[in-house]
Amino acid sequence: MPEVKVPELAESITEGTIAEWLKNVGDSVEKGEAILELETDKVNVEVVSEEAGVLSEQLASEGDTVEVGQAIAIIGEGSGNASKENSNDNTPQQNEETNNKKEETTNNSVDKAEVNQANDDNQQRINATPSARRYARENGVNLAEVSPKTNDVVRKEDIDKKQQAPASTQTTQQASAKEEKKYNQYPTKPVIREKMSRRKKTAAKKLLEVSNNTAMLTTFNEVDMTNVMELRKRKKEQFMKDHDGTKLGFMSFFTKASVAALKKYPEVNAEIDGDDMITKQYYDIGVAVSTDDGLLVPFVRDCDKKNFAEIEAEIANLAVKAREKKLGLDDMVNGSFTITNGGIFGSMMSTPIINGNQAAILGMHSIITRPIAIDQDTIENRPMMYIALSYDHRIIDGKEAVGFLKTIKELIENPEDLLLES
């Protein structure tokens, strides 16, 4: 019978975690229809069946890590089950599963891979996956004696664990003692221990890699936002009318300013590959977006060829896709430079961490009204923003980093020039 395998995703992605089965065992499946959602290091993707038929077996459970090319489901022939009345068209195995299924097992918390089997000795109903039930029969194991690890559903690995139990009892007891000692280190203090999501674990790993593998340094400057705020105030209503409701924000100004600065200082648009330095001739700018799953960085492509309205519309679209978990892998890879805005959370100053293999990242911050010396005799309150450029000192010299940030400052403080250049 045809197998559904984890498809090739992106060059850097070799595995994923099954987030949710979208089809139950016995359900009809159309060609090209999604049967499960896979969580990868970057985005969630739907895995589709290349054949029409019936989902006859799930070879992995929700929460399992699966590799690219691994078989995760089997598609059998038939039209599937719409209800118990249609079960006469199923295979004998499917009829057995349907007849033994508990009526109350309908809520979403139950693993979609589970089926029910009556124990021949005591008629007790046992929840088990089809592969586990078959494996138990082949090895003469009584499912009633197997302790399931997850969701009260017996799986193949639970049977293996039972068979290996005598040899591993001492090791298990030692491990349990270590765990107990670790948990009881502060017995009177409340703690919560939980596993990190795949995406958070990946982010933690990559952030540490950047910190360990780059000569990261941060330089700062400050920007007087008076002129750009006045320009935005004058233009925003007409801008929305002219561009189908698209709002004029600060991100488009900083994006266009970054493109101009990258052209002036191409080292900032580079990366190291072994002994080579690759200078990118394109301007795909990453914009950090905060979601419930953490920070994601989709890329606005070809920012040098887009106007302010196109950039603002694309940023808004990517933000919606990120929060609705609809970003594709194409949205998340092969960027050249990143902008992050900690100001939306109230950050006054920070040292952002370089994104992936890029050479630098620009940090925006809160706009704060502060007294500024205009000249020797005049002090005025001005809306000021600190900006930061974290950069890889292996590629970028301090002179170029300071010059880059100074270019950003000059363009934002003279936004009319930025508009003309666009």
From Swiss-Prot:
GO biological process: one example: tricarboxylic acid cycle
GO CC terms, sorted: cytosol; oxoglutarate dehydrogenase complex
Enzyme class: transferase
Catalytic reactions of this protein: N(6)-[(R)-dihydrolipoyl]-L-lysyl-[protein] + succinyl-CoA = N(6)-[(R)-S(8)-succinyldihydrolipoyl]-L-lysyl-[protein] + CoA
Recorded family membership: Belongs to the 2-oxoacid dehydrogenase family.
NCBIfam families reported in the protein's UniProt record: PRK05704.1, sucB
The protein, known as: Dihydrolipoyllysine-residue succinyltransferase component of 2-oxoglutarate dehydrogenase complex
Higher taxonomy: Bacteria, Bacillati, Bacillota, Bacilli, Bacillales
